[in-house]
């Protein structure tokens, strides 16, 4: 029975990932005053299926000097971790309702760094290695602010369980009292998922394609799916943290519809940002984090710690 539950979670995610690639190409197309994919099927709807077939029937070549086991293991690990992070997400009911769901998600996103590092190192190519080192530095750096922002939000929620956030936000969305945190969180999620304007790992003019430059066919598709699964997951996480949907146990469908609309709008904003902004320079990317975001988030975290103590407010006990 549990296996069926897992499949019921994984299959829709993979379908969503497939069609997000199409949506991205269509949105970017319309923003550049062109049509996007419109040949394969009506409105290009069969394009993701064609892409999947093409990628998975190609021969998975690898460099002669690469480390075979690690080279193959890295993309599998990337997708595995990307799918694992969906387990504690309340939509409205999670697959496993963990007491420390937020901590679990932080741990899994930190582990994802290894798949990037291994792929760059095992490729035995200077471009892949530089891309991997950039990606790792960027991911680790932005995880610092993500963790501090999460801590501040959880101080308002009073529990590490994600389902508690739904109860916390019945009266008011947390984006209203904590809008500076929400803005920094959104920008940090962009950097964490390696999206424009923070896609330094894929700087075409410098690194060809970043850490996955030596990958082709199936393994490349796994990296691609992991990236897009992470994008959707991060937007869902943002919707849960800051745009909490009121959950009526008698009509759980309303929660799901509400929640899906918010997540889709956030995903659309990712695509909009990609179409609008040029890429950052690497030093600007690090400057933004260590000299702007980190002091601000630390100050706000101290504020959220001291406020309940000053006003004798006791957070909800669970």
Swiss-Prot record:
Entry's transmembrane regions: 2-22, 70-90, 100-120, 146-166, 172-192, 222-242, 253-273, 294-314
Chief subcellular location: mitochondrion
Disulphide-bridged cysteine pairs: none
Membrane topology note: Multi-pass membrane protein
Record localization: Mitochondrion inner membrane
GO cellular component: mitochondrial inner membrane; respiratory chain complex I
Record's keyword annotation contains Transmembrane: yes
Name of a matching Pfam family: NADHdh
Entry-annotated residues carrying N-formylmethionine: 1
EC numbers on record: 7.1.1.2
A GO term, aspect molecular function: NADH dehydrogenase (ubiquinone) activity
Function: Core subunit of the mitochondrial membrane respiratory chain NADH dehydrogenase (Complex I) which catalyzes electron transfer from NADH through the respiratory chain, using ubiquinone as an electron acceptor. Essential for the catalytic activity of complex I. Essential for the assembly of complex I.
Family: Belongs to the complex I subunit 1 family.
Subunit structure: Core subunit of respiratory chain NADH dehydrogenase (Complex I) which is composed of 45 different subunits.
Name this polypeptide is given: NADH-ubiquinone oxidoreductase chain 1
Naturally occurring in which organism (per UniProt): Bos taurus (Bovine)
Lineage, top ranks: Eukaryota, Metazoa, Chordata, Craniata, Vertebrata
